[in-house]
Amino acid sequence: MLIDISIKNYLSFKNETIFSLRAVSNKKDTKVNILSLKNDIDVLKTSVIYWYNASWKTNLLRSIQTIKVLITDSWRLGPSDPLFALWWLSLQPFRLNESTRKEPVEFKITFEINWIIYRYELSLDWMKICSENLYSKKTQKEKTLFKRILQNITIYDFDDNNSIKRVNENNLALSIFAKEGSEEAKMIHRFFQEIYVFFWDWSPSDSELMMINEYETFKPFLKSLLNKADLWIEDIDFSLKEIPFNQLPKSETLKAQLQSQWIPIPENVKSHIWNMYHPVYDDNGNIVWQHAFSVNDESKWTNKILNLAWSIYNVIRQWKILFIDEIDASLHSSLLLSLIRSFNKTNTNSHCQIIFTTQNTHIMDIKKTLRRDQIRFVEKDKFWSSKLSRLSDDSIRKEYITEKNYYKWIFWWLKNNEERDDLLND
């Protein structure tokens, strides 16, 4: 499970910013939203992030995606490849300060695998790894597994499978160790592979969509989700069809992207085809047959739910971690509430975690849905640096955290307005 992420000098985050999923001890808050790990660590299963306009909240999710790709894929880089060659990664430092724009990006992440707490630290620029450290804790005492400064790597208590010499200045040692067969590194590698970051310009790959046909339980899940959204689709099917590359939507844009990565342009590609079956009625209101509609005939909202459904299903089924940017762009409030409550349940979807950004005010009722430590805010300071806070950091009275009072306290929080005295305890 994910515990903490620290970001420093990355995109809009100038100073060290910690996104923590550690639960704050409060007897008044419900316990169903947390899981207890070793060493007396209670971890939240869900977290909601609100933002003020132009606060760059998406950069928080980009940092997660960057850490994931670096760990899972940096072994692919040749000795002279820049780090941003990995999936168009952005490794820009904070550029609105003369000092930070010349300094490396820094990440720290704490997570749990099989009751072991790991802490991983990373510092890098666009061409090289500056430092890299890995620690673990099974009991109360933390031990160092390996440390790295530039190309000097010291192994303390870690099986690198004799692959230390294969680490170039632009490869993460952890990524190389996993590729070369280190069992502990492979376990950590799998953990990061199972973190999903969902942006709305993303859609499932053909391989993921092919998996849908292999899982009989996904189809009822998807139908249930669509029908809860009042779409009343009777049936769904999916197939792959080979079509000429130039017939793809936005083929010229795709072509330019492939050419920028020195990837050959294929003559034909496999495109996924969804059919949605809606009932056809006779004059007496009886269903007489079903008509198949292409997914292109469905609404934009239906297509968004379709894209998101696979990620939600996969995370629930395999106990993974899901970050979603602007979840309210797809899900109706009732669906969103149902999803949050499902993830919050301790005995259901046991080790799943979901973190999302939203401006949906219908989930603000803490007594029924959220703890105060599950609600976060991203704002920007006068120097245009993003800051992250959570509601439990201040003494706002619990009864004020409702949709009715949203516009009072959200603007107090972000703009420090005159409502402050009304919302704070005496």
Language-model regions: role of each:
Residues I117-E252:
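Electropositive, glycine-dotted interaction segments
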Residues K14, K102-P104, W115-I117, W126-C130, ...:
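Coil-to-beta-strand transition motifs
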Residues M1-T72, D282-N416:
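Switch/communication elements of ASCE P-loop NTPase nucleotide-binding domains
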Residues K8, S205-D297, K415, E419-D426:
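Extended helical coiled-coil dimerization/tether regions that scaffold
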Residues D4, I18, E106-T110, R119-E121, ...:
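Beta-strand secondary-structure signal
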Residues W51, W56, W87-W88, W115, ...:
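Low-complexity basic/metal-binding stretches
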Residues L35-V48, Y52, R62-R119, D125-W126:
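Conserved P-loop NTP-binding catalytic core
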Residues I7, I109-W115, S136, H278-N284:
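Short acidic, glycine-rich loop/turn motifs
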